[in-house]
C-alpha cells in the first residue's frame, strides 16, 4: 500500500514544475521499517511469478523516485530499515536524527536488498554500500552521517526542522527546469559510453543555457537582481 501511495504522488507531481520538491517522512516519528514480512511469509510459499511481480513493481517505483525531476528530501526519525532506507537512498538529500536507527537488514532474514542495492551504492559508494548490505550492519544516525547515508545529522527536533528549512530555501533559489536537467545529467552520465559523454554533457548544458531559465538566470546575474523563479519562505 505504501508503495502504491508513493507511486501515486510521483505520478501526480512529476510534470508539475511549479512543485519544486517532495519531502518523504514517516508518520508518528518513525520513517519506515521496511517490507511487509507477513506478506513475504505468504509469498515465500506461493508462485515465483507473484514474488517477481511484486519486486518488479517496487523496482519501477524506486526508479521513478530516483529520477523525479523535483528535488527529493528524506527526513528520517525513529528508524529507517531495509527497503525503507532504500527509499531514502533514492532521494537527493537525506536528513536524520542522530539517535535514529539504520540498517539494510535483508540478509538477516534470508533475502537480498535486490531492488534497493543500486541506490545504496549510489548513495554511499561501492565499498561502504557493499559492506552494509552484505553484513546487514546496524548503525545510528551519527554513523550514518559519516558513512554518507545521511547528508545532514540533527541532534534534536529543533535542529532537524532548521536543517529541513535550510534545504527548502536552497531548493527555492534553483531553477526548476535546471534541477530536472541536472538530475538527467547525473543519472544519465554513468550509462553513457565514454565516447559520447562530452556530447551528452554539451547538449545538456546548451539546452539549459539557451532555454528560458538560462536566459533569465544570466540576465538576473548581470542586472544584479533575483531570477523570476526565486521564492522565499
Predicted regions: what they are:
Residues 1-27, 49, 60-63, 166, ...:
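Conserved CoA-thioester-binding segment of acyl-CoA-metabolizing enzymes
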Residues 25, 32-40:
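Short, conserved active-site loops that position catalytic residues or coordinate cofactors/metal ions
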Residues 34-35, 128-137:
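Short helix- or helix-capping micro-motifs
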Residues 42-56:
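A short acidic, glycine-rich active-site loop
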Residues 61-109, 138-141:
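Glycine-rich beta-to-alpha active-site loop
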Residues 95-100, 150-199, 212, 228-233:
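C-terminal long alpha-helix characteristic of the crotonase
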Residues 118-127:
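Hydrophobic, secondary-structure "cap" segments at the distal end of domains
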